[in-house]
Amino acid sequence: MTDPPALSALTTMRVGGTPERLLEPADRDALVATAREVWSTGDEWLLLGGGSNTIAADDGFEGTVLRIVTRGVERLAAEKGRIRLRVQAGEPWDALVALTVRNGWAGIEALSGIPGSTGAAPVQNIGAYGQEIESALIGVEFLDYLTGEVYTLARAELGLGYRTSALKRGMAGVVLSVDLELADHSVPGGVGASLSAPIAYAQLADALAVPLGSRVSVDELRRAVLALRASKGMVLDPADPDSVSAGSFFTNPIVSENVARALPSDAPRWSLGPPEPDTILSLGPEGVHPLDVPPFAAGPYEAKLSAAWLIENAGIRSGFALPGSGAAISSKHTLAIVNRGAATAADVAQLASFVRGRVQADFGVVLHPEPVLVGLTL
């Protein structure tokens, strides 16, 4: 594209300058060929999907933005009662969820309303309302940056952790497609009447007025999730200024038992077992992947904390903004930073740094951003 748009036009936070180049390969084969060509130049490159998890600097990007727009959903052979899908990386995630619900397939219905592309879902290891993509993920087709080869990577090879993966932490390349396996819990009643996976999130169970572990129709569960997300400004809506964001800006921190015990007694925390180390199977000719991917966690981390609680109890409330800034904490959800209409990327980074500094000063816990920051530091 000879005259690319600013990244503010391609991201949900609506900030970011103009890249040098923007390429949008139309299909899988063109994506492979284009990526290899870009990599052969040695220039800087950036992958961009739906733009819901990327915040780019105001001066743009000095290099090539490779925008993933490939589409398509293919049904694969599967055992009775199971559904297998191969989804092209550029397929919008929520459109995929809507498709599965219409067909009565269960397994990702609680992930309704999450913006972005399907290829980014395993990279970020998305999850919400008690459901994780990890539980439905079979694997991905992956174009490796270092070798230029296309590999099929099983779920166990992706180093999945809480909102992270080896793909996010340094395993450079392009996810070409994602394979998922869902359940077909069909019951009489027509489209959307199949039963959901057991409800594992208290707020969702309360919204549906059912006990934890219950099942409702996948359609009913999707509608409940979308309503909950909309109440927090977490569904893209031109009429809702709180939806001009990158979703939750900070992940819930995972800390040691000692750090968790030092917090006030009313601080929410969830006990965790020690994480399993990454398993990256052979991709290189010597039997070892040529890139050393850092593990998800190096020590016996045992508790997950609520980032929202930490932010609120550090004195930062909904709607908070720094003087003269176009960025603010969402009026509906303290985990989200929103563009109030004229924010710059610098405004967003400044507010995020302020929030992180307050939490660290008050509780000794460092919050980590969930979106990918391009040309920005906190």
Swiss-Prot record:
EC number from the UniProt entry: 1.3.1.98
Pfam families: FAD_binding_4, MurB_C
Key words, A-Z: Cell cycle, Cell division, Cell shape, Cell wall biogenesis/degradation, Cytoplasm, FAD, Flavoprotein, NADP, Oxidoreductase, Peptidoglycan synthesis
Co-factor(s): FAD
One BP term from GO: cell wall organization
rRNA-binding listed as a keyword: no
Domain FAD-binding PCMH-type: 15-185
Location(s), subcellular: Cytoplasm
Catalytic residues identified in the record: R163, S248, E370
GO cellular component, as recorded: cytosol
Pathways involved: Cell wall biogenesis; peptidoglycan biosynthesis
Catalytic activity line of the entry: UDP-N-acetyl-alpha-D-muramate + NADP(+) = UDP-N-acetyl-3-O-(1-carboxyvinyl)-alpha-D-glucosamine + NADPH + H(+)
GO MF, one annotated term: FAD binding
Superkingdom of origin: Bacteria
Disulfide bond positions: none
Main location: cytoplasm
Keyword Cell wall biogenesis/degradation included in the entry's annotation: yes
Family: Belongs to the MurB family.
Free-text function comment from the UniProt entry: Cell wall formation.
Protein name, entry field: UDP-N-acetylenolpyruvoylglucosamine reductase
Organism: Leifsonia xyli subsp. xyli (strain CTCB07)
Gene (name only): murB
